[in-house]
């Protein structure tokens, strides 16, 4: 794990389902391709994931890793806590409003150079 850099965003105001839709598009890609893909997606989740990815890139640069040789080795979104509220409905009923949060994890690694 010495050749990895990570960034974690906790309590993002975003449901994990919506975050995973964007995350699945960039999993395993190199960082230049991933940033290009994220910049073209018109979703709030793309902006949030892009911010976390840029943070991971900055962490990798701080650790002295080669920025041009990085790829997304692992990325996932987990479910955070849920705020539960109730809204009144017809005939005296109430339904629950679930405000979902996410924890987004991004791990970057350097590509291994093959000797020939």
Curated annotation (Swiss-Prot):
Protein name from the UniProt record: Large ribosomal subunit protein uL22
UniProt keyword list: Ribonucleoprotein, Ribosomal protein, RNA-binding, rRNA-binding
Name of encoding gene: rplV
Source organism of this protein record: Sulfurihydrogenibium sp. (strain YO3AOP1)
Function in brief: This protein binds specifically to 23S rRNA; its binding is stimulated by other ribosomal proteins, e.g. L4, L17, and L20. It is important during the early stages of 50S assembly. It makes multiple contacts with different domains of the 23S rRNA in the assembled 50S subunit and ribosome. The globular domain of the protein is located near the polypeptide exit tunnel on the outside of the subunit, while an extended beta-hairpin is found that lines the wall of the exit tunnel in the center of the 70S ribosome.
Chain segments annotated as coiled-coil in the UniProt record: none
Family under the similarity heading: Belongs to the universal ribosomal protein uL22 family.
Alphabetical list of PANTHER family matching this protein: CHLOROPLAST 50S RIBOSOMAL PROTEIN L22-RELATED, LARGE RIBOSOMAL SUBUNIT PROTEIN UL22M
InterPro entries reported in the protein's UniProt record: Ribosomal_uL22, Ribosomal_uL22_bac/chlpt-type, Ribosomal_uL22_bac/org-type, Ribosomal_uL22_sf
Pfam families for this protein: Ribosomal_L22
GO molecular function: rRNA binding; structural constituent of ribosome
Assembly mode: Part of the 50S ribosomal subunit.
BP GO annotations: translation
Domain of life of the organism encoding this protein: Bacteria
CDD domains named in the record: Ribosomal_L22 (cd00336)
GO cellular component, one term: cytosolic large ribosomal subunit
